[in-house]
Amino acid sequence: MASADDYFSDFEDDELDKLYEKAINKSVKETITRRAVPVQKDLHDNVLPGQKTVYEEIQRDVSFGPTHHELDYDALSFYVYPTNYEVRDYQYTIVHKSLFQNTLCAIPTGMGKTFIASTVMLNYFRWTKKAKIIFTAPTRPLVAQQIKACLGITGIPSDQTAILLDKSRKNREEIWANKRVFFATPQVVENDLKRGVLDPKDIVCLVIDEAHRATGSYAYTNVVKFIDRFNSSYRLLALTATPASDLEGVQEVVNNLDISKIEIRTEESMDIVKYMKKRKKEKIEVPLLLEIEDIIEQLGIAVKPVLQQAIELGIYEECDPSQINAFKAMQQSQKIIANPTIPEGIKWRNFFILQLLNNVGQMLKRLKIYGIRTFFNYFQNKCTEFTTKYNLKKSTNKIAAEFYYHPILKNIKNQCENYLSDPKFVGHGKLQCVRDELMEFFQKRGSDSRVIIFTELRESALEIVKFIDSVANDQIRPHIFIGQARAKEGFDEVKYTRKHAPKGRKKVERLHRQEQEKFLEAERTKRAANDKLERSARRTGSSEEAQISGMNQKMQKEVIHNFKKGEYNVLVCTSIGEEGLDIGEVDLIICYDTTSSPIKNIQRMGRTGRKRDGKIVLLFSSNESYKFERAMEDYSTLQALISKQCIDYKKSDRIIPEDIIPECHETLITINDENEIINEMEDVDEVIRYATQCMMGKKVKPKKAITKKKRVQENKKPKKFFMPDNVETSIVSASTLINKFLVNESGGKQLVTSNENPSKKRKIFKALDNLENDSTEEASSSLETEDEEFSDDNNVFIAEGQNGCQKDLETAIIRTGESLTTLKPLHNFERPNMALFVNDCGLPTKIEKNVKDIRGNQHNLEKEKNCTVDKNNMVLSLDDWNFFRDRYIPEGVSFDVEPNFVQYTKGVKVPHCHKVSKIITLFNDESNDNKKRTIDMNYTKCLARGMLRDEKKFVKVNDKSQVDNNSVNHDSSQSFTLSNAELDDILGSDSDF
């Protein structure tokens, strides 16, 4: 017979693999090759720790079975290539490879990535009958652009498409079930996959735009991981202009998206050069102003002692004070904090030194790249913040105090204030270059041309707008274009000082403080309103307001609309304008600053030269030229490494059977009227609205007042959990997972099935569960005790007196009637417990049904004789009475009315009965060695022995059938009278006490 361990054995590894891979047609075969490698050994011929003696090579052979998608074999013989646009060689090649492999398409911006994706989607729409095609983009504007382009290229019927952007989940299940082509953000797809609304097995084609974002835990990565768990037979096409900044980043994207092939093109590629518009690049080196160099020198003098200390401690590399780098200082500080071996005191000292160097590095960067105005705002804020905290003793950083209280910083502050007080002062040479370039450009091209200026900092963007506006040229109309976040507020010295000032102990002081705070708050509100009113009067007022409060999507949309319309012809953008927005045709790009990221640089330059020639002006100061050239060289090297197959790719399913090789049919696609309408729309929200109405099968109508109607709530579909095939989805009880065994007569184990599970029937007395006993006797045995535990002898005898007459005792029975006189509960502490007394012959006195003579001191039972209760409310049922009659001795049982604890003992404890109270008092006296109690006990014992010796009857039973509780006298001294001689004889006898 199998042992118990066999029933609880774990799954084998191959069983687990089969369990997780039942739903996919992918099989992996691994071949491991091991080779011995030389290792270092000690004198005892033992391998040193950490040495590997074997080198392993793992080769994985991946194969795919037939796809689970329902294919249209009549359409598999060819694929359609639209000829509505110019046929380009690189697009033709990439489309052909993307149909049969998971491809990462990396080509310059404006080179038709959307056309490639649309063609792939069109053919998988033709080849499959029910499968889903999904196009994902990270933002709403990008999704709107893609649905506009795809429907205008492929001609896919609009009733088969859906756009999923809104947070509302209304009709989402129905949309996924009835449509085939979807345009959505990756977050929507991820959420619907997790909710069970979208079946991952239904997906046959997934297009990912801006694929360089597929790193870490971004939604793109999560979507692909989720689909891979259930489906390996789907095509993935990733689109980007720059896959990553380095080889490791490219490999991460390839791994996360299951890429099998990278199709990369540069502006110098042979098959793309002829289609590229001319982009003239102009690099301008801008020297630093003398005022800037003077401030840099003074900052170097102030920070030199701190820098020298950092160099001596080995936490920062040796350099000139003017070359302090904020990024390097931040990296070093993070390493120090993460190092657990450094003592806490040394760790925080080094951290504060590097933190100060980081702040100085930020000052130098702003001064060299953006100018004195941007520098002074940051410098003044940091100085004010530290000095205020240090004066209030909220900071004890002496290293930073040595710098911020340096006398030379006061000189820097005074110089900057003098410079900025002059309205004609130019804070940096780049501003003059921007003005000259714009003047020359608009004189040649006219005011109908468009210009974008890129900068990283918001303060710098606003400064550029104000400076351009000061030129007072009607041809140049600038506006800022930034993100939605509000500007960071500077350090408020007054607010911080008042917050940490003494609150005041007296009520008058607290009230005075509250009045001051209200007054200051009113002043701030009034000043903010006045400033806003002044800004609205200036031409740059909207830009200033946007810089303070940020630009929401509505404001961004309005600015872009005005830019396309010509109300503004110069946009000063932060990184928000680098990708993802359809800003339109731009003729001039000015990069006010540069970064070390080739992705950012390429995205910026890709905003021009799409449909006509453009110009790019790169402004360099300090070491920006070196950073730009190095970034572009690294990207060129990266492209070469990708072309040399230095990436570890993943094999993907062909989906189409191997014996079918589709031919290319170049076809002119006929676009229907609805798709043509979408293609002609310019407004993003209008495109989304129209596509949504087409998705819902509605005609576009002007908005009207809608009368609300009561909706009949439909039954929601239960959430669906996607699992591998042939998996038990129902709930399994724990008892079915355990095997039960019994030992049979031969001593072996016998498996017990669920039908053979033995169970003992036990008699339960429900009435006994409700009894409240107040006795010192031991509790009766458990109600679950079987009948056999009680004695079978129904005849009980009592020997009494010397004669020892024995007679059968009859159990006193109270017969239940249809109605009984209602009795109020008697308080046990007012009377002794009602036991059954025996007469001279030992026979019990029967207690009649009429119990009207039983009464308490506080309840008048005579007034309630006529009250009746149902017989079911008695203490015991008939079966319980019979059980007591057969099993119990009458002297040990007393029957009483069930007490109503809820009514009479609601707020107090139920006291003990008279008998129990006397026993408790007795034992307390014995524990306390009460002599009076001892004498009384001896006296009682002696009286009892004397009476037994004389054979006197000491129990007298009233012949009457009714017993009065008050007639019972428990004082033994009053029951008998003895002479003095008899008493002395008794007291002189031996005593057990």
Swiss-Prot record:
Residues 530-551 are annotated as: Disordered. SMART domains: DEXDc, HELICc. Keywords: ATP-binding, DNA damage, DNA repair, DNA-binding, Helicase, Hydrolase, Nucleotide-binding, Nucleus. ATP binds at residues 107-114. It is an enzyme of class 3 (hydrolase). Residues 94-261 form the Helicase ATP-binding domain. Residues 539-551 have a biased composition (Polar residues). Residues 507-655 form the Helicase C-terminal domain. Coiled coil: none annotated. Pfam families: Helicase_C (PF00271), ResIII (PF04851). One of its GO terms (molecular function) is ATP binding. It catalyses: ATP + H2O = ADP + phosphate + H(+). GO terms for biological process: double-strand break repair via synthesis-dependent strand annealing; interstrand cross-link repair. Interacts with the MHF histone-fold complex to form the FANCM-MHF complex. This is ATP-dependent DNA helicase MPH1. The lineage of its organism: Eukaryota, Fungi, Dikarya, Ascomycota, Saccharomycotina. The gene is MPH1.
